[in-house]
Amino acid sequence: MNIKDRTSEFQQSVLSYKKRNKNFREQQRERLQEKESENFANNTTGNGKSVSEFQKKASGIAHEISSTAQLLSKLAVLAKRKPMFNDNPVEIAELSFLIKRKIYAIEQSLVQLSQLKKTDVNGNTSNQSSKQPSAVQHSKNVVNLLNTQMKNISGSFKDVLEERQRLEMANKDRWQKLTTDTGHAPADDQTQSNHAADLTTYNNSNPFMTSLLDESSEKNNNSSNQGELSFPQNDSQLMLMEEGQLSNNVYLQERNRAVETIESTIQEVGNLFQQLASMVQEQGEVIQRIDANVDDIDLNISGAQRELLKYFDRIKSNRWLAAKVFFIIFVFFVIWVLVN
């Protein structure tokens, strides 16, 4: 009779059984944890509707504040550029309008959030025992933090607009000085020759003036050959000066409009600051009322504790009441013994 050693097979089967049993237990444990989490979520959804709504609204406001801060940083970079060389007034105006709309929308959302917090506090004042003071304090801290961040962003926006206005005014003064200097320049031969040289280089670089230069050169050659006097160069100079003055006037008008837009935006930001200050004042009044209510509750609790201690002392000193209680207990004990 041949005997085979199957110890290794038995050990392998035992290991495989242990692995299967371990995996089965882990699956059961995961299922139980999922059921417990679902039950806990179902139990807490009814109690935490206002809290979840408050948290969702606060997270949305925080996201809007962060996006507004990014736009404000971009606007600050654009506003610090020199308006004469590298300027983009259209993009600056669009960013200013977008930031202004975002600030107004965030202000309205903060008002709604503060109203939601007020309704939550007023709805739970009757059941102070079931109310969690940590949740109320957390909501209060969240509202105060969002108001502070919004105040900082509004202040930064106002500073950026004031810096932009300062640069615009400086550029406007510079252009006015340049135009007055060019208008009252001395008319000597040296300045005329320098201006003619600059005009020649400008005309050579300008493709629209090449035909005019060719015609003027031909007329100059004909007049020099025939001995006649002609001044087409002076006509072209006058035309170029008129074009330069028109372009300067258009540029100054655009700058004036940009300055007016910035001034109106600064005024609107000031109005938003006033609204934010009123909101902060209302929050301060609400906090003071909550503190007063907490003080009243502390006084009531201390008074109730004193009354309970007095009643306990009175019961302890009343021996006749203790004798009555003892006698009643003894009578019930005797009746119970007799009945049994």
Curated annotation (Swiss-Prot):
The chain crosses the membrane at residues 320-340. Residues 31-51, 180-231 are annotated as: Disordered. The keyword Cell membrane does not apply. InterPro entries: SNARE (IPR010989), Syntaxin (IPR045242), Syntaxin-5_N (IPR021538), Syntaxin/epimorphin_CS (IPR006012), T_SNARE_dom (IPR000727). GO terms for biological process: endoplasmic reticulum to Golgi vesicle-mediated transport; intra-Golgi vesicle-mediated transport; intracellular protein transport; regulation of inclusion body assembly; vesicle docking; vesicle fusion; vesicle fusion with Golgi apparatus. It is found in: Membrane; Golgi apparatus membrane. GO terms for molecular function: SNAP receptor activity; SNARE binding. Residues 146-173 form a coiled coil. CDD domains: SNARE_syntaxin5. Keywords: Coiled coil, Golgi apparatus, Membrane, Protein transport, Transmembrane, Transmembrane helix, Transport. It is a single-pass type IV membrane protein. Gene3D superfamilies: 1.20.58.70. Residues 1-319 are cytoplasmic. Residues 39-51, 189-209 have a biased composition (Polar residues). Signal peptide: none annotated. Residues 249-311 form the t-SNARE coiled-coil homology domain. SMART domains: t_SNARE. GO terms for cellular component: cis-Golgi network; endomembrane system; endoplasmic reticulum membrane; Golgi cis cisterna membrane; Golgi membrane; membrane; SNARE complex. It comes from the Eukaryota. Pfam families: SNARE, Syntaxin-5_N. Its main location: membrane. Belongs to the syntaxin family. Interacts with SLY1, STF1, SFB3 and GOS1. Present with 300 molecules/cell in log phase SD medium. Required for vesicular transport between the endoplasmic reticulum and the Golgi complex. Acts as a target organelle soluble NSF attachment protein receptor (t-SNARE). This is Integral membrane protein SED5. It comes from Saccharomyces cerevisiae (strain ATCC 204508 / S288c).
